[in-house]
Amino acid sequence: MILLDISSIDLSLISTIVIPPIAGSIIGYFTNDIAINMLFRPYKAIYIGKRRLPFTPGLIPRNQERLAQKVSDTIMGSLLTPEELQKLAKRLLKTERVKGAILWLLNLALKQVKSDKQQKTAKILSGILEDLFSESLPRLLKALARRQDFLEGQINQIFDQILLDFKLTDTQARQFADWLLEGVLPPDILRQALVDFLTERNIQVIDEGVREKTSGTYWVVANLFGVRNTLLRLRSFCLEEKEVANTRLKEILLSLEVRSRLREWLQSLSLQNLPVSTVRQLRKTTRETVQLYVQQSGEKFIQDFGKTVDWEQLSILIINRLQNSAALTTSLETISEELALILERYLEEDLEKIVAQAIPILSIDKVIIDRVNATSPQNLEMAVQGIVKSELQAIVNLGGILGFLVGVFQTLLFLLR
């Protein structure tokens, strides 16, 4: 009897009770997909004849340029503000990161120099050095030389620490004395100097002076015999007997121990033995002489000196030494750290200005607009669908639940009637 009652239930009543919740769940679950499809499709306008059908293309493809502008304004107005860009720049430009980047660049440059087969680096360095000595340094020296205190401290320091304490050693004094007696004043030179000195006029002056300024026994000898004949005979002897005269002069130098006396005099020669006033005046004269020379001829001297140097060969030598220098390799980290600290101090003061200047240059808003406009509606739809499925699945599920509840509510209303 019960089975007959169940089978006799009206199928329309069952469908009225069951279908609304099921239909509501289906509609609620797929509403998001339908809404997204309605926003993007159709992708292109549909024409019948020359007339475009309403609502074609979809809402977003039809207003993609305006959407791009809105996206750009939203991002630049709330996300990528100047303050946020400053924070981003500070995070990117932390000292450790900057140090690592600089160290990487320095190591890369060092590897490039080591692998340079055509000596390009040497040519660049030679050009820099040549310009430095031929143009830049002479101009700088010319400008600095106009100052009255130019090189004053340096010259005084050299004078006080080197020249004032300079003193010949025994070996140096011996070599200097030998050079003077053998190279500068040998017997032949002394003999010729004696001949040149004993002219007729000089002999007459000497003879008259001896006659007038002597007294006593010397006056008698000078006036009776005179020195004129003696000097004339000495001059004739030096002219006629050159070898003998040279030998006699050499013997005189040996007997007088001129070499030893000259060596002792050279060893005792020192500026410290001079009076303090004389030393001060000598230091002042030395400084003024050097300054005057630099002012008048320093520029030309440096230019001429630069022309005598093979800068390319010197550059190759410098680079080869740097390539094999262990100190350079170990100092790269220190250099990068110091440069990073310098950059950090600079950014602390001017980061706001730099960011303000960089924003118009980067044109981030234009980049956003161009990227949105360049993205096809299909790709935009796929991106939105991907976000919904991966990040907003709970909303989709909630839509299905709400649709089911609405269907149940409709069923209850129907039953209450």
From Swiss-Prot:
The chain crosses the membrane at residues 395-415. It is found in: Cell inner membrane. The keyword Transmembrane applies. It is a single-pass membrane protein. InterPro entries: DUF445, UCP032178. One of its GO terms (cellular component) is plasma membrane. The keyword Metal-binding does not apply. Keywords: Cell inner membrane, Cell membrane, Membrane, Transmembrane, Transmembrane helix. Belongs to the UPF0754 family. This is UPF0754 membrane protein cce_2569. It comes from Crocosphaera subtropica (strain ATCC 51142 / BH68).
